């Protein structure tokens, strides 16, 4: 389908490819050979003077003219030698032909306007342009160019035909324009003014001149030759005729004025002033003398300064002075210095004896006694923290939590009619709590010293262990030489020092093991409690409403309170009045059962539960919590705490 459509479009197209008439193959004219091309000389030419005896029909002749006209514009590329000069010559030829055709059209148009009686003021300009243009047109072409541009001659007839068609179209337009112009001219026929009459006469004269110029001004073989300017001749004539320009006249006038002014100044008389007497005074000589005196004074002054600062050379005296000083110093140093050799003192005998060990023991004992006495003094002067003192003082006066009934109660409680002001009580309680909170003191650590190493049982055990090691080890047996044998040579003092150092090292006992076990157990329990607290905290966080929900709840509460207050204001009530009445009504409801029974004034009110009692119970709970925390701290006590207790 697409192929059929393409073939139909190609067949119906206006542009058709050239075909060889013999082979019917698509081939352009310049690609064919010379023998295959149709020669115009063989065919019957309407332009040639000689005609054949055969008579050609009219339809064949018209068809031949059409084909001939079409063949004239066919451009044979093989004849062109592809040079720029030939190309530009051909372009110039075409341009000249086009200009010639346009001139013919203009002349025809002007002729029509002249026949219709319309004046065109541009005729003179066009005529002048024709004259100048004719000078620029080329007279003839070279024979070589004529041979190469044979086929371009057929362009002018086609242009002529197109010009005839355009003139026919322009003729219709010109008739319309001429009729409009005639109407405009007839509109001014009623006026009779001499100026217009003169213009009309001038118009008729101009038309006559144009007619004569059209007839006379035809193309002629004349060329305008430029002539040189005659400026020098003109200037010489002006000089002969004494013709001056405006600038020359002005210059002469100015010179005359200046000359007259100078002559007037020269004719004036003047008298010179006498020479002043100061001119005759010898001022210059005085200045020269003054300068010489100043120069002499400066020279003498500078000489005096130089003589004062000048000093003679004293190298020999300086060297002698140095030698004497050096000798004096040497004598002084030899007299003072005495040869003192170092001599070490002998080692005191007390070091090798047992007295030093006893003295060290005594000093250590005195130190321990002093520290013990100091600890007792500090213990007596110390006091409990304020929180524990307050709890102890309060514990003696506080009431018991649980009350046991002792049979029937003999007295009846007195119920007070007055309602306490809970807000003031709460504020007072907060103040008391803040005061007690700020009054806490920090406990200070005190030095301590354990005396477990001084126990006799431990010393005996250590000595027995040392003896067993010395007996059982292989190094102490013969024939081996052991370092322990050399230790027996040392004195008893060094042995006692070694024993003391060994006794001071901590030993693991059963009590310490039990204490460590208890500590580990408590730590495990503490970690479990901590994990439980974390889980409870996470649960609270999960159950806690979101921030948006809390904001919504708070907004709802505020809106409800605002609505409640608005209702109270509308009714003319006060918030305090409502709270008082509500509290009194609640108390009346509780007391309504016992209205008939009156309580005597002398009875006690021990059974009442006022707000103060509730607050006391809260304080008791706090003190119980503090005591539990103290117990936990005791449970987590370390060896250092036990050492402090022993001290």
Swiss-Prot record:
It holds the Pfam family FAM161A_B. Residues 510-524, 588-600 have a biased composition (Basic and acidic residues). InterPro entries: FAM161, FAM161A/B. GO terms for biological process: cilium organization. Residues 152-161 have a biased composition (Polar residues). Keywords: Cell projection, Cilium, Cilium biogenesis/degradation, Coiled coil, Cytoplasm, Cytoskeleton. It is found in: Cytoplasm, Cytoskeleton, Cilium basal body; Cell projection, Cilium; Cytoplasm, Cytoskeleton, Microtubule organizing center, Centrosome, Centriole. Residues 613-638 have a biased composition (Acidic residues). Residues 243-268, 518-544 form a coiled coil. The keyword Coiled coil applies. GO terms for cellular component: centriole; ciliary basal body; cytoplasm; photoreceptor connecting cilium. It comes from the Eukaryota. PANTHER family: PROTEIN FAM-161, PROTEIN FAM161A. Involved in ciliogenesis. Belongs to the FAM161 family. This is Protein FAM161A. It comes from Xenopus laevis (African clawed frog). The lineage of its organism: Eukaryota, Metazoa, Chordata, Craniata, Vertebrata. The gene is fam161a.
């Amino acid at each position: 389908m697409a192929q059929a459509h393409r073939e139909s479009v190609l067949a119906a197209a206006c542009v058709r490819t050239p075909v060889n008439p013999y082979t019917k193959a698509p081939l352009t004219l310049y690609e064919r050979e010379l023998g295959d091309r149709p020669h115009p000389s063989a065919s019957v030419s309407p332009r040639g003077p000689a005609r054949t005896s055969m008579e050609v029909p009219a339809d064949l002749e018209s068809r031949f003219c059409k084909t001939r006209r079409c063949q004239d514009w066919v451009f044979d590329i093989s004849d062109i030698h592809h040079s720029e000069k030939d190309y530009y010559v051909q372009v110039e030829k075409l341009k000249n032909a086009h200009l010639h055709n346009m001139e013919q059209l203009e002349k025809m148009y002007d002729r029509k306007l002249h026949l219709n009686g319309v004046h065109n003021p541009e005729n003179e300009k066009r005529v002048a342009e024709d004259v100048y243009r004719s000078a620029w047109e080329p007279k003839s072409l070279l024979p070589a160019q004529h041979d190469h541009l044979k086929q371009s001659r057929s362009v002018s007839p086609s242009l002529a035909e197109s010009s005839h068609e355009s003139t026919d179209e322009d003729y219709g337009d010109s008739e319309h324009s001429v009729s409009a112009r005639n109407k405009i001219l007839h509109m001014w026929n009623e006026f009779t003014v001499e100026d217009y009459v003169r213009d009309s006469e001038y118009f008729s004269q101009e038309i006559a001149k144009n007619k004569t110029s059209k007839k006379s001004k035809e193309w002629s073989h004349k060329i305008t030759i430029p002539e040189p300017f005659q400026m020098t001749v003109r200037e010489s004539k002006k000089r002969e005729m004494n013709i001056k320009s405006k600038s020359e006249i002005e210059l002469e006038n100015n010179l005359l004025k200046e000359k007259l002014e100078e002559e007037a100044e020269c004719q004036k008389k003047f008298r010179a002033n006498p020479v002043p007497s100061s001119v005759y005074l010898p001022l210059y000589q005085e200045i020269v003398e003054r300068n010489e005196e100043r120069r002499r004074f400066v020279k003498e002054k500078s000489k005096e300064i130089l003589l004062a600062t000048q000093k003679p050379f004293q190298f020999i005296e300086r060297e002698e002075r140095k030698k004497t000083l050096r000798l004096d110093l040497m004598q002084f140093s030899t007299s003072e210095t005495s040869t003192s050799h170092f001599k070490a003192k002998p080692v005191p005998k007390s070091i090798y004896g047992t007295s030093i060990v006893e003295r060290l023991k005594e000093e250590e004992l005195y130190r321990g006694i002093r520290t013990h006495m100091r600890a007792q003094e500090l213990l007596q002067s110390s006091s409990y923290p304020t929180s524990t003192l307050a709890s102890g003082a309060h514990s003696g006066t506080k009431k018991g939590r649980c009350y046991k009934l002792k049979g029937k109660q003999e007295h009846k409680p007195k119920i007070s009619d007055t309602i306490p002001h809970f807000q003031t009580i709460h504020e007072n309680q907060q103040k008391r709590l803040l005061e007690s909170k700020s009054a806490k003191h920090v406990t200070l650590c005190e030095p301590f010293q354990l005396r477990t190493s001084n126990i006799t049982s431990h010393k005996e055990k250590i000595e027995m262990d040392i003896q067993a090691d010395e007996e059982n080890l292989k190094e102490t047996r013969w024939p081996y030489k052991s370092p322990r044998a050399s230790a027996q040579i040392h004195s008893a003092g060094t042995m006692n020092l070694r024993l003391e150092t060994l006794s001071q090292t901590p030993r693991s006992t059963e009590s310490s093991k039990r204490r460590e076990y208890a500590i580990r157990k408590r730590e495990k329990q503490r970690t479990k409690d901590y994990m439980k607290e974390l889980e409870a905290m996470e649960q609270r966080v999960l159950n806690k409403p979101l921030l948006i929900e809390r904001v919504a709840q708070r907004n709802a509460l505020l809106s409800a309170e605002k609505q409640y207050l608005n209702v109270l204001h509308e009714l003319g009530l006060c918030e305090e009045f409502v709270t008082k009445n509500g509290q009194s009504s609640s108390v009346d409801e509780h007391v309504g059962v016992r209205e008939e029974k009156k309580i005597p004034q002398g009875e006690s009110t021990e059974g009442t539960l006022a707000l103060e009692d509730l607050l006391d119970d809260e304080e008791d709970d706090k003190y119980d919590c503090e005591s539990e925390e103290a117990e936990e701290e005791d449970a987590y006590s370390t060896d250092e705490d036990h050492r402090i207790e022993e001290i």
